[in-house]
Amino acid sequence: MAKYNAIEVFEKIGSKRVLPLFNYADIEVCKSVMRVCYAAGIRVFELTNRDSAAYDVFKKLVPFVEKELPELSLGAGTILDMETAQKFIDAGADFIIAPNLDAAVGKVCVDNYVPWIPGCFTPTEMKYAHDLGAEVIKLFPAGSVGPSYLKHIKGPLPFLKIIVTGGVELDELTISKWIDAGVFAIGIGSQLFSNQAILKQAYDLLEAKMKSIIQLTAKKEGN
């Protein structure tokens, strides 16, 4: 059962404008990355369902989060069908994220009162997702179109809350452009949590980089 409701989950995402997403078969690595994000001030985390170990890792992370990261909302990403959505919800997912728009997945989430963040690319998909109950939408792959695309979408659809993921660069100028375009949050995955950084166990460096990213979003928001 979800620990946090939609209002709380979206507040956690929007407060820092950052959503970390990660997947690794070694649960200890996942714990270390989650600790890094938590120490940097993040209170929401997406574990992506991108390999056969993801579900078992997720189930084991739920009690870890409750004990060691009590303010963290843990969600499941890369959820492609309603059966998988229900399975992760039953395991304790606070929210469900997908790279695509699937009405059946949305219905499972709505029926279980669990926030659903579907992946969309066109204004038509985004409006349809919103009508199906998605309060927040993921623009994916955002890096292939850039901030100007989001700005044009927000013009006629200003009520949409949009997270951008997929090839989003993390330099100050790019982050600034996304925020100016009206982004709700930026999804951060392999751009920060690279295999090289994980293999080197460079967790102090990852924490410092995450803090610097949060400072950029907070600085821009305050201007």
Language model: regions and residue ranges:
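Short acidic active-site motifs
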Residues: 29, 57, 83-84, 104-105, ...
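Glycine-enriched alpha-helix->loop->beta-strand junction motifs that scaffold or abut catalytic
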Residues: 41-43, 89-96, 111-117, 131-136, ...
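Catalytic beta/alpha-barrel core
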Residues: 21-23, 43-52, 71-80, 93-101, ...
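Glycine-rich phosphate-binding active-site loops on the catalytic face of alpha/beta enzymes
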Residues: 95-105, 139-146, 182-203
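Catalytic cores of alpha/beta
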Residues: 81-91, 124-132, 169-186
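Short beta-strand/loop segments at the ligand-binding rim of alpha/beta enzyme cores
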Residues: 15-18, 65-76, 94, 108-117, ...
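Glycine-rich beta-strand-to-loop/alpha-helix junction loops that act as flexible
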Residues: 76-77, 164-168, 186-190
